[in-house]
From Swiss-Prot:
The modification N-acetylvaline is found at V1. Pfam families: Globin (PF00042). Red blood cells. This is Hemoglobin subunit beta. GO terms for biological process: hydrogen peroxide catabolic process. The modification Phosphoserine is found at S44. The modification N6-acetyllysine is found at K59, K82, K144. Residues 2-146 form the Globin domain. GO terms for cellular component: blood microparticle; haptoglobin-hemoglobin complex; hemoglobin complex. The lineage of its organism: Eukaryota, Metazoa, Chordata, Craniata, Vertebrata. Heterotetramer of two alpha chains and two beta chains. Keywords: Acetylation, Heme, Iron, Metal-binding, Oxygen transport, Phosphoprotein, S-nitrosylation, Transport. Belongs to the globin family. One of its GO terms (molecular function) is oxygen carrier activity.
């Protein structure tokens, strides 16, 4: 993904303040609530029957944290997202059969959650930089599908 030096600075500056545990669970939880068809990939997570059940689900929180830790790895390797996410792309494509469109959805939900958490600090410039990053990550995760 091509980011200017300023965009990289905006992304990494904000990311240093992100509580990965909290934001990861919230982002994955919101994905499962806003786009309920994504729940079919999480059959083993137990009760996802209501928004409260989803947001309180320990497995959703744990997997959300795992997802954001991987996203953090991507932020450290912005010039090689395909390489960084190659194994995860293979796993999600070959074993889990996740629709790659879901990666875009999760990226957009993550942007919403960051905006919610950071308010005025999440300026349009910060959002624009994050939109580039989440699109790049989604593309890298979908790479095995092409």
């Amino acid at each position: 993904v091509h980011l200017t030096a300023e965009e990289k600075s905006l992304v990494t500056g904000l990311w240093g303040k992100v509580n990965v545990d909290e934001v990861g669970g919230e982002a994955l939880g919101r994905l499962l609530i806003v786009y309920p068809w994504t729940q079919r990939f999480f059959d083993s997570f137990g009760d996802l029957s209501t928004p409260d059940a989803v947001m309180g689900n320990a497995k959703v929180k744990a997997h959300g944290k795992k997802v954001l830790n991987s996203f953090s790895d991507g932020l450290k390797n912005l010039d090689n997202l395909k390489g960084t996410f190659a194994k995860l792309s293979e796993l999600h494509c070959d074993k889990l059969h996740v629709d790659p469109e879901n990666f875009k959805l999760l990226g957009n939900v993550l942007v919403c959650v960051l905006a919610h958490h950071f308010g005025k600090e999440f300026t349009p410039q910060v959002q624009a930089a994050y939109q580039k990053v989440v699109a790049g990550v989604a593309n890298a995760l979908a790479h095995k599908y092409h």
